[in-house]
Regions:
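The feature primarily captures lumenal catalytic ectodomains
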Residues: 1-358
């Protein structure tokens, strides 16, 4: 089968109604940040008839268009190298020959099935699940004026984190999970776009919708220090020294904590201090005015994901740079990039100066 590889956002703009138009904002989270002004992509809900969905994930339309970009980016150079991770194609190009396995299942009912693609590398990352998967419920509600639970969702692969969130927050949600390397056929498939691009340029209304839909209204009075002592990397090696100096603060470990517990914890936080990590996705639940200090390092100063969330929700967010402490040995499972495989040390005096200045 010869398919046209679709990557331009104009393809979707010409075919489907736009829900969120592009929006520009500025986030001044650190004086040395390489970029501070960002522009969002338009959002939409695509509709495909007589199409095939593959668990890689990708969609092949009835016009033989291959859809990955703007629904879930297919990073073929790093994650999906032909003949190593799949046998669908041998060479990536604008027009390419693919070998799609026969459809294992077929679904014909219109306006019922919603495509939720995600790759196995991101499937249990809290930030990706909230920002790139669950956020798509909002586009479905805005497009069709129905509750998101009126539809059936199709996840391109398993996600234990999504399962946990579903059990606690929306147990009535109906969804299927595609087995690896399988193809399903749909008479009509709804495909919401991402509300995030370039790893953190998020649509403001999406972030606000998540807090409104799943957050709690609490008395924000707790000062919390998020421990990453059980994480494989980005641990604060002088965390004990820092905490001893943080009079009246709580040290919290998120591992093993339920989803509702985490939402309640961050809803009650007036101050949050943490090294950069997926646990900061919980900033979604903080009340406006919450003060956030994110401990990072120079090599990661382009990571704007959490400062942008804070900007949209009216939080006061600052990034402080610590000293990188290399970890000996090979990168371990759970760390995506080699540059992320290190720990951090922070000057206590600099941290307190920043806290007192907020």
């Amino acid at each position: 089968m010869i398919v046209k590889n679709i990557s331009a956002i104009q393809y979707f703009q010409e075919r489907f109604d736009i829900i969120d138009t592009p929006y520009q904002y500025t986030v001044d989270y650190h004086p040395a940040a390489p970029k501070k002004t960002f522009t969002t992509n338009p959002t939409f809900v695509a509709e495909f008839h007589d199409c095939f969905a593959h668990a890689l994930p990708l969609v092949i339309t009835n016009e033989n268009h291959m859809i990955t970009s703007h629904l879930w980016p297919l990073l073929h150079n790093t994650k999906y190298k032909p003949q190593k991770t799949h046998d669908l194609w041998s060479k990536w190009n604008d027009n390419m020959e693919i070998t799609l396995p026969p459809a294992h299942k077929q679904f014909s009912e219109p306006y019922k099935y919603v495509w939720l693609p995600i790759d196995e590398h991101s499937a249990n990352n809290a930030w990706h699940i909230w920002i790139d998967v669950i956020s798509k419920f909002r586009l479905i509600e805005k497009k069709f004026s129905h509750k998101y639970t009126d539809f059936i969702y199709v996840l391109s692969g398993p996600s234990e984190y999504f399962d946990r969130v579903a059990r606690e927050l929306f147990p009535e949600l109906r969804y299927y999970v595609m087995p690896k390397n399988t193809t399903w056929k749909f008479g009509h498939l709804l495909a919401p776009s991402m509300s995030n691009h370039e790893d953190g340029i998020t649509v403001p209304d999406m972030i606000k919708w998540l807090r409104h839909k799943f957050g709690m209204v609490c008395n924000a009075r707790r000062k919390i220090f998020i421990s990453r002592d059980d994480a494989p990397a980005r641990r604060l090696i002088n965390a004990e020294q820092v905490f001893m100096a943080l009079q009246g603060w709580e040290t919290v470990t998120l591992t093993g904590m339920g989803i509702k517990q985490q939402i309640e914890l961050f809803s009650e936080a007036s101050h949050v201090v943490s090294t950069h990590g997926a646990g900061l996705a919980n900033l979604l639940w903080c009340a406006s005015g919450t003060k956030v200090i994110e401990i990072s390092q120079t090599e990661m100063l382009d990571k704007k994901v959490y400062p942008v969330i804070s900007h949209h929700l009216g939080l006061i967010h600052r990034v402080i740079l610590g000293e990188k402490v290399e970890i000996r040995g090979d990168k371990v499972k759970g760390v995506k990039r080699k540059k992320d495989f290190n720990d951090i040390s922070i000057q206590t005096s600099a941290l307190f100066e920043l806290i007192n200045g907020l």
